[in-house]
Design a protein with these regions (language model features):
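All-alpha prenyltransferase/terpene-synthase fold signal
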Residues: 1-201
Length: 201
């Protein structure tokens, strides 16, 4: 029912919010302790609401696979941190772990809700969410020791993922879904042409 869909969407959004807030807790001790404690508590609050909604519905299976996704995300973030500390973070590893972080929650739903288009949805989710994050990371969250050429590599990778998504959507069976996905890509990545070249503003 529509109510169930809304509750599932709300639960997944709450999990993502909890992850985002916890990830923003600064390890820098110059940040006031109280501020960091409040951030942790805020993340715990959203995480608790996610459990509350699904437990009330008796959806233990959903709790289980979303919790598994959270574990995967946290492990990927730990991997990135360890690689960064040891100066072993390559572009390939960065993209690989970023893809896990960006897509684990939605992919857990795709594995739960099997459909004939499941493989296409899986590829589309991976491509678009990873591309979106890579473009965001180009704003300044990349390791300082990486050469400037890395920016070009990540930008090209993002464009490649976007173009792969466009080609994937072209073969979509449902024309309505195809139009909606094409619109989504154009709205989300307005400065990228079909050739993967940023348009002049």
């Amino acid at each position: 029912s529509l109510k169930h869909i809304r509750e599932y969407c709300a639960s997944t959004a709450l999990v993502q919010m909890a992850l985002n807030i916890h990830n923003e807790v600064s390890p820098d001790h110059s940040t006031p302790l109280r501020q960091r404690q409040l951030q942790v508590l805020a993340g715990d609050f959203y995480s608790g609401k996610f459990y509350q909604i699904l437990a009330h519905r008796g959806d233990t299976h959903v709790i289980h696979f979303l919790s598994d996704a959270v574990c995967l995300i946290n492990q990927a973030r730990t991997n990135l941190y360890d690689l960064f500390l040891n100066n072993q973070l390559s572009v390939e590893k960065y993209v690989h772990e970023t893809e896990k972080i960006c897509t684990a929650l939605l992919k857990s739903w795709l594995q739960h809700e099997r459909t004939k288009d499941n493989d296409n949805w899986d590829k589309l989710v991976s491509n678009l969410l990873t591309a979106e994050q890579l473009i965001a990371d180009l704003s300044g969250t990349l390791p300082a020791y990486w050469p400037s050429s890395v920016n070009t590599q990540l930008q090209q990778k993002a464009w490649q993922l976007i173009e792969q998504s466009r080609l994937l959507v072209q073969d979509w069976d449902s024309q309505k879904t195809k139009r909606e996905l094409e619109h989504l890509i154009e709205v989300t990545f307005p400065g990228v042409t079909h050739l993967g070249i940023a348009e002049e503003c």
